[in-house]
């Protein structure tokens, strides 16, 4: 008896995956739905945080827009490097056909932002007018944490949409299941139900194995957490600036822990739980820092504290009419 492709090594074989190419340019250049969905996730996240900066925090959204040109290449490179680190042997530059690990993209994006925003926000044109306790108009430099609170949670939008790209590619499926266990999926989302099948040939018969829609679970949890963070935590006045962005790392770690046990064996690797633990720890420590330690440090970012070591003169707030060099002041605003 001949047995072929019973257990998928990386992707499923079904009708959904067979149509993963959206269109072709010429005869050799294919554009995949994965890439289109990936770009849509980026654009939706950009639109969301730009509106947030403009209407909620009332600070210039230009720095966030210009950050796109740094974030996109850094995120893609970081995601690809991370994918290689966990064992993806595809061609490094084959971005259109999957092979992007979101953890690497997040790390690369956050590190680049930690360098970019403290530098660009020192430019006087991005400073904002505010009132001091006496009603005098002063100039303040927006905090990097404002942009972090606006931008970092929108990563969840990209992650939620990106999982649907994985679905069309036949990737990120859960453990083996049965048709009876997934009757709810067949009724609610017939196309997804069909997309979770893996067809194989046994002798002269075509059979299939069906898997849990892990991508759907992660996508759903990402949306729920985003709504909770962006439209719940953001409006709790007792929470300090930066808490919202740090909560992303905590909750994303929780999501990964909760879905890891349902992951198919070929998508698990030794460092998974270590990485998830680091996400949780970083989120908790970061939240504690911005909520309790940062106020003691007068809400000044670490880079500013280091710079101040070289300046003995104490910074003072000036009335707007007396202000000459707004870039020299390290004040922050958070509305």
Curated annotation (Swiss-Prot):
The chain crosses the membrane at residues 31-51, 67-87, 100-120, 213-233, 235-255, 277-297. It comes from the Bacteria. PROSITE patterns: LGT. GO terms for biological process: lipoprotein biosynthetic process. Keywords: Cell membrane, Membrane, Transferase, Transmembrane, Transmembrane helix. Its main location: membrane. It is an enzyme of class 2 (transferase). Belongs to the Lgt family. PANTHER family: PHOSPHATIDYLGLYCEROL--PROLIPOPROTEIN DIACYLGLYCERYL TRANSFERASE, PROLIPOPROTEIN DIACYLGLYCERYL TRANSFERASE. HAMAP family: Lgt (MF_01147). Catalyzes the transfer of the diacylglyceryl group from phosphatidylglycerol to the sulfhydryl group of the N-terminal cysteine of a prolipoprotein, the first step in the formation of mature lipoproteins. This is Phosphatidylglycerol--prolipoprotein diacylglyceryl transferase.
């Amino acid at each position: 008896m001949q047995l072929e492709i019973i257990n998928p090594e990386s992707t499923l074989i079904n009708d959904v995956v067979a149509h993963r190419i959206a269109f072709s340019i010429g005869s050799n250049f294919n554009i995949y739905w994965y890439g289109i969905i990936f770009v849509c996730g980026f654009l939706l996240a950009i639109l969301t945080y730009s509106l947030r900066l403009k209407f909620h925090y009332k600070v210039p959204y230009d720095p966030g827009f210009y950050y796109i040109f740094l974030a996109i290449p850094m995120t893609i490179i970081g995601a690809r490097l991370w994918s290689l680190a966990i064992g993806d042997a595809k061609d490094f530059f084959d971005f259109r056909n999957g092979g992007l690990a979101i953890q690497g993209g997040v790390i690369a994006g956050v590190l680049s932002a930690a360098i970019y925003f403290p530098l660009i926000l020192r430019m006087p044109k991005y400073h904002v007018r505010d009132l001091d306790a006496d009603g005098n108009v002063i100039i303040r430099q927006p905090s990097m944490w404002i942009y972090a609170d606006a931008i970092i949670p929108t990563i969840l939008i990209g992650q939620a949409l990106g999982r649907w790209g994985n679905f069309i590619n036949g990737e990120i499926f859960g453990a083996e299941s049965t048709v009876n266990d997934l009757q709810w999926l067949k009724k609610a989302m017939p196309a997804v139900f069909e997309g979770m099948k893996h067809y194989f040939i046994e002798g002269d018969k075509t059979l299939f194995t069906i898997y849990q829609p892990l991508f759907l679970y992660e996508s759903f949890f990402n949306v729920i957490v985003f709504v909770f963070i962006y439209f719940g935590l953001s409006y709790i006045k007792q929470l300090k600036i930066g808490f919202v962005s740090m909560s992303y790392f905590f909750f994303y770690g929780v999501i990964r822990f909760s879905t890891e046990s349902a992951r198919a064996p070929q998508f698990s690797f030794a460092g998974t739980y270590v990485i998830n633990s680091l996400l949780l720890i970083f989120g908790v420590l970061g939240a504690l820092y911005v909520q309790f330690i940062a106020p003691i440090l007068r809400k000044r970012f670490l880079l500013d504290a280091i710079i101040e070591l070289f300046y003995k003169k104490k910074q003072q707030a000036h009335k707007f009419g007396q202000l000459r060099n707004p870039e020299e002041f390290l004040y922050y605003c958070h509305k």
